Amino acid sequence: RHNPILLTDGYKPSHHKQYPPEVTHTFAFLESRGGPFDQTTFFGLQYLLKAYLAELTITLEDVDEAYAFFAEYFQNPTIFNREGWEYIVREHAGKLPLEVRAVPEGQRIPIKNALLTVTNTDPKVPWLPGYFEPLFVQLWYPISVATQSRAMKDIILANLQETGTPELIPYKLHDFGLRGVSSIETAQIGGAAHLLNLGIFEYPPQRREPAAQPAHGAGRNKQHDQQQHHARHGQLNAA
């Protein structure tokens, strides 16, 4: 089990001292500022929340552990917000008073738009949304994988539609990420993000008639007949 209080950057525990006393709420958001694609595919939030935040309860033992850690880290026992975390344990039974809103997972969103927002629901903990910023930024990885995988799928699917076998799209872009990432968990997260695009062809899946002939090995002079066949079966423009 992870101690949620330790899932942050080293300097974050000092930020509670920097908010003006009249501040009661803060509002944080995550967006894609830009990149090679004009849209991002949002994915990974549900796993992050369930694994690290929503289903965990902060205990006094967690607070004691974090206090000891940051007292040594800062060489100062007064930096860590022990009072604030004990308040969460006492008044919220260890549950984080945060409200997280997000676009639906799997949805493509134009860049420079908010993908998720985080705010505190208790006016006594305005420092809390920013405290977990580093954890929410972990979403960069599943979002990046899902976005790039979707872009690759679009390119492959366009060519499959031209050559007559778009129903083969689930088998045209394979995931070999396990051997190239830093941990088993990273591979699981990246694999799930890729599976979002290529694991199932349609939502919900629909039964299709098999193609009359395979596309592989067909020359350009055979493509017209194949396209006519699939157009008659409603497969040419499948997405």
Spans of model-derived segments:
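Low-complexity, highly charged intrinsically disordered N-terminal segments
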Residues: 26-81
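Buried, small/hydrophobic-residue-enriched core segments of structured protein domains
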Residues: 1-36, 88-97, 106-109, 115-239
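Outer-membrane beta-barrel transmembrane strands
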Residues: 102-103
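Exposed alpha-helical structural elements
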Residues: 44-48, 52, 62-69, 83-87, ...
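An acidic, glycine-rich surface segment that forms the CoA-thioester-binding/catalytic face
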Residues: 69, 74-78, 82-89, 93-99
